[in-house]
């Protein structure tokens, strides 16, 4: 629950607690908060163990679809489509097909290397600032 709270944030919370509650009531508030969190954690673990006892081996069958959903949460839309609809073949989405292999150009001696000349026309489309 507090896995992504760093020491800096904890320090800000303690200072805010000192300002809001004062030094007299802060230790009691910390004890109450830690007790409430501990009790909530015990309730959750108790509910999990009770479900495990009630369902028996079916509990693991219930967890499998949840684990599959957890795997899907981390996927991007492109990865999900590639995995489930295209069987891992993303050439349809990337446009890189097997029969189009990059052709290797013959190597020329280094003495004949010339600096590339800039083309007269821009490489991209013409930009028209008046177009809407």
From Swiss-Prot:
It is a single-pass membrane protein. One of its GO terms (cellular component) is TAT protein transport complex. The keyword Hydrolase does not apply. Gene3D superfamilies: 1.20.5.3310. The chain crosses the membrane at residues 2-22. GO terms for biological process: protein transport by the Tat complex. Residues 91-132 are annotated as: Disordered. The Tat system comprises two distinct complexes: a TatABC complex, containing multiple copies of TatA, TatB and TatC subunits, and a separate TatA complex, containing only TatA subunits. Substrates initially bind to the TatABC complex, which probably triggers association of the separate TatA complex to form the active translocon. HAMAP family: TatB. Belongs to the TatB family. This is Sec-independent protein translocase protein TatB. It comes from Mycolicibacterium smegmatis (strain ATCC 700084 / mc(2)155). The lineage of its organism: Bacteria, Bacillati, Actinomycetota, Actinomycetes, Mycobacteriales. The gene is tatB.
